[in-house]
Amino acid sequence: MRFLKKRGAVGIGTLIVFIAMVLVAAVAAAVLINTSGYLQQKSQSTGRQTTEEVASGIKVTSIVGYAPYDDSNKVYKPISKLAIYVSPNAGSAGIDMKKVRVILSDGSIEAVLKYDNSDADSDGTLDKDVFAVGMPDNVFEDDTGTTAYDGDQYITWSELNDKTFGIIVVQDSDGSLKPLTPTLNKGDIAIIAVRVGNYYVDSNGNLQAYSPTPDGVFGEGIKPNTHITGQVVPEHGAPGVIDFTTPSTYTQSVMELQ
């Protein structure tokens, strides 16, 4: 009988150990399930962010430059204006143009420009004429430094300087590109207007300097045989690339550079 009692005691002890092991396993399983759930959600979030970062971005489709013609001396001056055509990458989310930065360098100067959407008196209109909608006869039309459009929105090139760029809307089916809140969406095309020099030609064909004279990005402008590099950098996603060399001589005012 004593032997049987010992066997019963051993059986109860084994049962207690077994129950304890089951409880420990249950706790461990719960921890693993919670951890795996957290990691799954974290990986999904990271995946979405990575996909957005890779898919999002802005691309530079072309760059056109303008060199004013000095009729009195029969010579083209350095390039004074750049029209940088941009659109969003395929699959990109909306790009807030207020947060886009344009970086330009000629090897000696590096400038960083932003869109000036200031509205000091809060009347719902821009303080400067740096936004335009529609297709003009000439993007670089320049009687008084102004590109005119139908309506009351137009670009005044003289109000751009070495720290700001303007926006000319070429295509915007959903109306997302607005003066104070310009957002570049799928299918949109816009021109980033950059004044890189200080001269223009008036309606009489005479060479004029902007007055008062706010500096262009590269002073007098971009001279022949100059290598320009840079980027159009959105808040999120891949930047658009700027990389071109100007012709060795200028033989016309409007020229495609990239």
Curated annotation (Swiss-Prot):
The keyword ATP-binding does not apply. One of its GO terms (biological process) is archaeal or bacterial-type flagellum-dependent cell motility. InterPro entries: Flagellin/pilin_N_arc, Flagellin_arc. It is found in: Archaeal flagellum. Keywords: Archaeal flagellum. Residues 1-8 form a propeptide. Its main location: other. One of its GO terms (molecular function) is structural molecule activity. It comes from the Archaea. Pfam families: Arch_flagellin. One of its GO terms (cellular component) is archaeal-type flagellum. Flagellin is the subunit protein which polymerizes to form the filaments of archaeal flagella. Belongs to the archaeal flagellin family. NCBIfam families: arch_flag_Nterm (TIGR02537), PRK08541.1 (NF006325). This is Flagellin B3. It comes from Thermococcus kodakarensis (strain ATCC BAA-918 / JCM 12380 / KOD1). The lineage of its organism: Archaea, Methanobacteriati, Methanobacteriota, Thermococci, Thermococcales. The gene is flaB3.
